[in-house]
């Protein structure tokens, strides 16, 4: 059975970020360039402003095969003065769900 509280998602997220900025000296938000992580980064910016902790550190691990609009969104977010972006491109072995012949692929493969 579900148990509801008298708070909405925004209020709960705000409380959590206030706790984070009160109890931790270093904060870094993981950013995937999706809409959920975009909301999370904006919530972190709001909290950092309240706690005088700007800019927000954000980490984006580039998987190489991304849509142009997703990359454009990352550029927009990381060009904001409230954000210090860490854009990382590493050769990482990943599962490949789109091929039966190549079950894994290596993003940022220097040999290709």
Where do the model's predicted regions map?
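ATP-dependent adenylation/nucleotidyltransferase module used to activate substrates
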Residues: 1-112
């Amino acid at each position: 059975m579900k148990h509801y509280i008298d708070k909405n998602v925004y209020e709960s997220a705000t409380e959590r970020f206030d706790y984070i900025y009160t109890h931790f000296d270093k904060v870094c938000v993981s950013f995937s360039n999706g809409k959920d992580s975009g909301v999370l980064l904006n919530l972190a910016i709001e909290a950092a402003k309240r706690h005088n902790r700007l800019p927000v550190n954000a980490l984006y691990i580039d998987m190489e095969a991304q849509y142009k609009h997703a990359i454009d969104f990352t550029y927009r977010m990381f060009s904001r003065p409230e954000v210090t972006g860490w854009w990382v491109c590493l050769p990482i072995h990943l599962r490949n769900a789109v091929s039966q012949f190549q079950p894994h692929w290596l993003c940022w493969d220097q040999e290709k």
